[in-house]
Amino acid sequence: MQGGEPVSTMKVSESEGKLEGQATAVTPNKNSSCGGGISSSSSSRGGSAKGWQYSDHMENVYGYLMKYTNLVTGWQYRFFVLNNEAGLLEYFVNEQSRNQKPRGTLQLAGAVISPSDEDSHTFTVNAASGEQYKLRATDAKERQHWVSRLQICTQHHTEAIGKNNPPLKSRSFSLASSSNSPISQRRPSQNAISFFNVGHSKLQSLSKRTNLPPDHLVEVREMMSHAEGQQRDLIRRIECLPTSGHLSSLDQDLLMLKATSMATMNCLNDCFHILQLQHASHQKGSLPSGTTIEWLEPKISLSNHYKNGADQPFATDQSKPVAVPEEQPVAESGLLAREPEEINADDEIEDTCDHKEDDLGAVEEQRSVILHLLSQLKLGMDLTRVVLPTFILEKRSLLEMYADFMSHPDLFIAITNGATAEDRMIRFVEYYLTSFHEGRKGAIAKKPYNPIIGETFHCSWKMPKSEVASSVFSSSSTQGVTNHAPLSGESLTQVGSDCYTVRFVAEQVSHHPPVSGFYAECTERKMCVNAHVWTKSKFLGMSIGVTMVGEGILSLLEHGEEYTFSLPCAYARSILTVPWVELGGKVSVNCAKTGYSASITFHTKPFYGGKLHRVTAEVKHNITNTVVCRVQGEWNSVLEFTYSNGETKYVDLTKLAVTKKRVRPLEKQDPFESRRLWKNVTDSLRESEIDKATEHKHTLEERQRTEERHRTETGTPWKTKYFIKEGDGWVYHKPLWKIIPTTQPAE
């Protein structure tokens, strides 16, 4: 291993056990590039670190951390090794003694990893045996790296206890001897389940019974339900406190108490589940045929009572829900027509709504809500069914966000104006990369509404033909392209019009999983795009990742070409401090007919250095393996296009004109169209009335759940309105390629 640069002297206060200086600690990784070198000497420690990219794979991590020993000795550097295969956290006096017996070992199965709320460097590892390591990293980023790796390893081995391990013999220890003996403190627990029997004679007697009654876990369930009720009362009393004063609901100790109590209940639920699995493995061979096993869940689910970090006001008799006149009653909404409806374009007017969004900034005021939410989540957990707090919402639906990706219709229409297959692929990449800054509103750290199943959104754009012909995005090979000759099949109205029309429709076709379908077309230019997207969200520790599963197909019927493309992932970072959003991942664009393809990479910011929102791309002719265009820059700022002829073009997205979409007034929209459906939520958010917005949002979600239960009970399948399922995807019911025949131009 190579040494790094020397760093500043470190000073440790023995009386207080606090780090007063700063040193560099590195956690290299054997299996990835996320590593660094470590060197040590008697006087200083140095290191070099590369940017860590988050991964949810299990990795062996090792490096120096500071370990708090006691008030006399204080903090000391120790060399730590995370052994994922064995599920152990080991430490040594230094790196040179790594081949010797470890100085200490913690079993991670059943452990709890807790970042400190006092500073951004410290964290604790609490083993199921009761032993605790208090550790300190060099900075917040290094701490997050260690915490993430430890949590992944802990979750893996905790789940393995119930799934893979056979029941072990219970062992009981003397609490007095185990707590006072240094040897017993250092000895790792052989299995996390053994700790659950410490000092509990009642459980010991139960373990000796050979034939347990089928309902022996009912008492445990009742005790857990009672504990959950007390925990809910605790949180309710804390949140009833004023937000300011001597004792407030935002007091740091109370916030930590809330988060810790919720985490404790989650751990107990995990333990209860393990007991059920163990009991099932005992009874599996002796059950008569046809017998079914039902899990004994607590009577009241915590998640049902704390959707947004507190009890919902409408759940009590003391509070009256706000009237929602525009929202459709349950009985009536279930009878809405599901047949496709033709939208009258004459009813559409230019959008006048103010869509300006303020960034979240620091979230100190909502810290209690976020801490409560985080206490319910596990690393890698699917967030599809998790209700996120209302204050992070944009004032638009996800379906409208997809429409906003079309806010440059001039660039979209200009794709088919390309004189060659190469030019058309480059134009598509130019359009694709310029669509995100408006679709994502720059990089605002908010999320759109999750669409209700059956929700739709309609709009259109009018684009003067002269602006498309003189588009500044035309490359040098197409500068002379003018308005095309009338296409066969175009109506006299379309030929005589000075504007192209791009029409857009989107529909939420599925609720679980959440899948949206959207379709846009320009009939005059014989082009359309059809896409389906499944938004799959995941909890990543201090960030949330959203994978856009699915694909889109752009059809240029005039040229007989199809361009298949995918979408990048989105990440919400620093959700506890100042949230921000970035895009990440590799996407591809392919045209099978012409042999041209594009590879686009949205780069996530590394922990150390690097730029935000960076994107690079290459357009290649696969047959000759020739790169015809390269792109670099930021997807929400400036893009640089370099063409094969040496020409370079810069596009400042902040100055790029946005064409306003045309929508029908609310009174002419159907009850399930996005803006009318979410009107009360949007109005409340505009007035900064978060509680009222939460109530309206809950009403919509409850209606959706009620209708879903009704369909399940009656065996009625959901019928989509505008999209038809074909294979694994969804296709618009009247795509342009079924109406207008594809032209096969001469090569």
Curated annotation (Swiss-Prot):
Spans traversing the lipid bilayer: none
PTM sites of type Phosphotyrosine: 62
Positions with biased composition (Basic and acidic residues): 689-713
Single biological process term from Gene Ontology: lipid transport
Disordered: annotated span: 1-50, 158-188, 689-714
Modified residues (Phosphothreonine): 27
SMART domains: PH (SM00233)
Keyword annotations from UniProtKB, A to Z: Acetylation, Endosome, Golgi apparatus, Lipid transport, Lipid-binding, Membrane, Phosphoprotein, Transport
Residue ranges of every copy of the PH domain listed in the record: 58-155
Compositionally biased intervals (Low complexity): 170-184
Pfam families: Oxysterol_BP, PH
Organs and tissues of expression: Present at highest levels in ovary, testis, kidney, liver, stomach, brain, and adipose tissue. Strong expression (at protein level) in epithelial cells of kidney tubules, testicular tubules, caecum, and skin. Present at low levels in subcutaneous and visceral adipose tissue (at protein level).
Subcellular localization(s) per the UniProt record: Late endosome membrane; Golgi apparatus, trans-Golgi network membrane
GO molecular function, one term: sterol binding
GO cellular component: cytosol; Golgi apparatus; late endosome membrane; membrane; nucleoplasm
Domain of life: Eukaryota
InterPro entries given in the database record: OSBP_sf (IPR037239), Oxysterol-bd (IPR000648), Oxysterol-bd_CS (IPR018494), PH-like_dom_sf (IPR011993), PH_domain (IPR001849)
Modification sites for Phosphoserine: 15, 172, 174, 177, 181, 184, 189
Catalytic reaction annotation: a 1,2-diacyl-sn-glycero-3-phospho-(1D-myo-inositol 4-phosphate)(out) + a 1,2-diacyl-sn-glycero-3-phospho-L-serine(in) = a 1,2-diacyl-sn-glycero-3-phospho-(1D-myo-inositol 4-phosphate)(in) + a 1,2-diacyl-sn-glycero-3-phospho-L-serine(out)
Modification N-acetylmethionine occurs at: 1
Record family assignment: Belongs to the OSBP family.
Role according to the record: Plays a role in regulating ADIPOQ and FABP4 levels in differentiating adipocytes and is also involved in regulation of adipocyte triglyceride storage. Weakly binds 25-hydroxycholesterol. Interacts with OSBPL9 to function as lipid transfer proteins.
Quaternary assembly: Heterodimer with OSBPL9.
PANTHER family membership: OXYSTEROL-BINDING PROTEIN-RELATED, OXYSTEROL-BINDING PROTEIN-RELATED PROTEIN 11
The protein, known as: Oxysterol-binding protein-related protein 11
Record gene name: OSBPL11
